[in-house]
Regions:
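N-terminal export signals
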Residues: 2, 7-27
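N-terminal auxiliary segments of SAM/dcSAM-dependent transferases
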Residues: 96-185
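Class I SAM-dependent methyltransferase Rossmann-like catalytic core
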Residues: 180-185, 189-210
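Conserved alpha-helix/loop element of class I SAM-dependent methyltransferases that forms part
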Residues: 205-226
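Class I SAM-dependent methyltransferase SAM/SAH-binding core
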Residues: 231, 237, 241-286
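A short acidic, Gly/Pro-enriched loop at the edge of an enzyme's catalytic core
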Residues: 285-297
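A short glycine-rich, Lys/Arg-flanked "PGG" loop and its adjoining helix->strand segment in the class I
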Residues: 312-324
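C-terminal alpha-helical "lid/dimerization" subdomain adjacent to the S-adenosyl-L-methionine
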Residues: 329-395
Length: 410
């Protein structure tokens, strides 16, 4: 369903906040709309309706099946009987399942797959995951002309704009098939359409995008209260970008990513729901954006997808494009250097990390998880603050990702 921008502004809670707080002060007035991520008002929640999606019920049914299989696997693994079985298996190896162990994540996985139940469940999950990606990919390629024409209609349309750079030098680290998505984010023309339906088994709050709203609502603003320009770095298909615009409707909001296909779909969605944001294909190591341009730069679940040798370059670039007093809002897995960090060293915890690394193609995640990320922020000149609330992954995990704030000294 298309929602006209003027309709949204006339009826939504965001519009009420604009009218109340901004009055006639104009675009430069700070308007900060508070939204409950897990109880969004209908007029905002409806903006997250899937603009994309399948055109045919048989494709939808296949996706529902693989989603259901994964739900069964997850529920089965959590059953007390399965937990007791795994504990008995580890005890047969003279290992207390609750104890930390001195072995690598891969060694822990190789130990657990000696248990037939664990091995079968892990194999079924990986095969089902492949089918879950394959279904939308086949569906969109089967009707490629239709979907390409749909995006062509909005490529040059507003509100907002799309900036693609076919000559951009894509880092090798971004060419991996992240999350095991065939073709990856940069090599698959329908990456955005496929990602929306396949990521997190299609259950990543597609109805209300609670994670994106939680991510942006947790952001700390600059001390002087000025928020005119915001950048969502590694924006993917643009959920966080739109959520930043919902929170700060008067701000100029950018979404930047190296993946052109994701940005093309992000812009398509933004046009369809009438959101005025800018999506631009750039490399986070060297964006080409002006010094001190942004008041807030945010990244959500981005840095663990960046190669270790590139992380410092990206962090230096974030520091450069923030104005003095500007804020970097970081949401990702907890690492060393965080005051609440406790490394998981049980056999099951280590094996789970290995499965995520290999079966979910999280190529750079192990290195990120073992890094001192707050230390990296300090190394480029940020003052680091841990006081902001965590961001959630879903209504069932409302505080699952820590927030780390970097403040550029004035």
């Amino acid at each position: 369903m298309e929602i006209e921008r003027r309709t949204f502004l006339a009826t939504s809670a965001a519009a009420a906040a604009v009218a109340t707080q901004a009055g006639a002060a104009g675009r430069d007035a700070l308007v900060d709309v508070k939204i409950d991520p897990w109880n969004q008002p209908p007029e905002i929640a409806q903006l997250w309706s899937k603009v994309g999606g399948f055109r045919h019920q048989d494709d939808e049914s296949r996706q529902d099946f693989t989603r259901g299989v994964m739900s069964f696997i997850q529920r089965d693994a959590a059953r007390p009987e399965q937990q007791q079985h795994l504990a008995a298996f580890l005890k047969s190896k003279k290992i207390n399942p609750l104890d930390d162990v001195e072995m690598t994540d891969e060694e822990a996985f190789q130990l657990l797959v000696q248990d037939p139940a664990y091995a079968a469940r892990t194999r079924l999950a990986r095969t089902n995951f492949a089918l879950h990606w394959d279904n939308p990919r086949r569906a969109f390629h089967k009707e490629a002309d239709y979907y390409l024409s749909e995006m062509e209609k909005t490529d040059n349309a507003g509100p907002g704009r799309l900036e693609l750079n076919p000559d951009l030098d894509i880092p090798d680290s971004a060419r991996h098939e992240i999350h095991a998505m065939p073709g990856g984010y940069v090599g698959e023309p329908f990456a955005g359409w496929i990602y929306e339906l396949g990521h997190m088994y299609g259950t990543a709050d597609l109805k209300d995008r609670g994670r994106a709203v939680s991510y942006t609502q947790a952001a700390k603003g600059p001390a002087d209260g000025k928020v005119r320009r915001i950048l969502d770095l590694g924006c993917s298909m643009g959920d966080g970008t739109l959520a930043f615009k919902m929170r700060f409707p008067n701000a100029e909001v950018w979404g930047v990513d190296v993946a052109g296909p994701l940005l093309r779909y992000a812009h398509y969605r933004a046009v369809k729901v009438g959101m005025d944001v800018i999506y631009s294909q750039r490399n986070g190591e060297n964006t080409g954006l002006p010094d001190g341009y942004f008041d807030i730069v945010g990244s959500c679940i981005t840095f663990h997808e960046i190669a270790p040798d590139a992380q410092k370059r990206v962090m230096k670039e974030i520091h450069r494009i923030l104005r003095p007093g500007g804020v970097y809002h970081h949401v990702d897995f907890m690492t060393d250097g965080h005051p609440d960090y406790t490394p998981i060293k049980t056999v099951a915890g280590r094996a789970g990390r290995w499965v995520d690394h290999r079966h979910n193609v999280e190529t750079w995640s192990p290195a990120y998880r073992h890094s001192d990320f707050p230390g990296l922020m300090r190394a480029v000149g940020f003052d680091v603050d841990f006081s902001q609330p965590p961001a959630g992954n879903s209504v069932d995990r409302p505080r699952s990702f820590p927030t780390v704030t970097g403040i550029k000294r004035a």
